[in-house]
Amino acid sequence: MPSRNSINKPKDKLQRNSHASSIGKKRSARARNGIVTKSSTPRYETDSNAAPKATESKAIALYNGATTPTGVIINNTLSNKRSKKIARNKKYIAKRNEKLNIDLLADQEQMEVDEETEKEEQTKAKNQTKLDKIKEVLWAAVEDRVSEGLKVSSGTDGNGTTLGVQAF
């Protein structure tokens, strides 16, 4: 006698057989009476008269400009989802390229401005007097001193600063 959890119990076998046969009868009745659909035909049957499923996606043919001169027919297709994704990516690429072109033009304009300022500085340097040159050197020294910031002299042992022992 089979165990309590066995799948080979006679009662379970009878129930499974009757269930499978009733489903098979319903399927064959639908095939005889109803419209032929993809769900009512076997998976690998290539019946062109079968109506498409409600959830079946519509494919879009993929064309890349001119046709190939070899005359070979290619049946590459795209789903709606994939075609929308490609269109969206093309839009993003176009925006990015436009932004890069704007940046490139701005850089070129800035380079032109730099060339003009260099010419102005050269003409200004030619017209400077000795007094102007001395003023420029002194102001450069002051700016260098200010940009160095505050220097803390730590002494020899570093006491009283955070460099040595932290005792206040």
From Swiss-Prot:
Record's subcellular location: Cytoplasm; Nucleus
Domain of life: Eukaryota
GO CC terms of this entry: cytoplasm; nucleus
Keyword terms of this UniProt record: Cytoplasm, Nucleus, Ribosome biogenesis, Transport
Keyword Cytoplasm listed: yes
Region annotated Disordered, chain positions: 1-56
First-listed, main subcellular location of the protein, grouped into a coarse class: cytoplasm
Biased composition (Polar residues): 36-49
GO biological process: ribosome biogenesis
Keyword Transmembrane included in the entry's annotation: no
Quaternary context: Component of the nucleoplasmic and cytoplasmic pre-60S ribosomal particles.
Family assignment from sequence similarity: Belongs to the ALB1 family.
Record's function text: Involved in proper assembly of pre-ribosomal particles during the biogenesis of the 60S ribosomal subunit. Accompanies the pre-60S particles to the cytoplasm.
Name by which UniProt lists this protein: Ribosome biogenesis protein ALB1
Gene name per UniProt: ALB1
